[in-house]
Amino acid sequence: MKPFYIIYICLLFVGVSCTDVIEVDVPEAPPRLTIEASLDWEQGTSGSDQTILLSTSTPYFAEQKIAPVLGASVRVTNEDSGAEFIFEDQNNGEYTTSNFIPVIGDTYALEVIYNDERYTATETLVPVSDIVDVFQSTEGGEDKDALEVNVTFDDPADIENYYFLRFKSDGDLFPELYYIKDEFIDGNEFTIYYEKIEDEDDAIKEFQPGETVDIAFYGISKQYHDYLRLLVDQYENSGSPFSPTPVPLVGNCVNIDNPNTIAYGYFR
């Protein structure tokens, strides 16, 4: 997306008012394939039901913000066992399977064929630590009078771990994302808090009694941790006049047939 500026110039003349309308063509990038492929294994389930989302990027001012991809071929292969899992086209941008077999520590390869071009990516299924406690308090946040949600987990010792924590409360348009590296918490119990600071300009309100918060906690690879860090940093700094111009983030999905045709999104 190219940045643009709207500049208003008022010229005052005695007895004269003149308005010039200038139309400027904003260059548009070609549509790119966007791959949202998160193979998540929720504790207490078999992990057999998985969904991969495919869409194409759209111009910033387009009326249709999401353009689902139909007719693609999607396959995931366990590179350790050779097992293949075909994801069926649901004709709405979703590709699903109900027979996926997750194996912690195994490496999986994604293959997407779209417009006669092949996109591939590989990722290892990473374990996640157990959540020890979830509680509310008013002690750990910035505002000592505001409610916050706390999540405590144990980090295994002498193992390099990376985590992804997602909070989404009632009425939130977007979730709050946290990426965590265990460099300074290795082998220890760690608590992270989620607090909503009231902001009238952004229509953000503090947590209210009875409000529900959805919490998801993932183990992730170092590569995905680094991708998330860039993604979150760009989002949080996008409103600052001193922040660098955002650039499209390219994940781990590579076009084998035409490397110059990049894909957005990530396979994990």
Specify the residue positions occupied by each region the protein language model found.
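A sequence/structural signal for flexible, mid-protein segments enriched
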Residues: 19-268
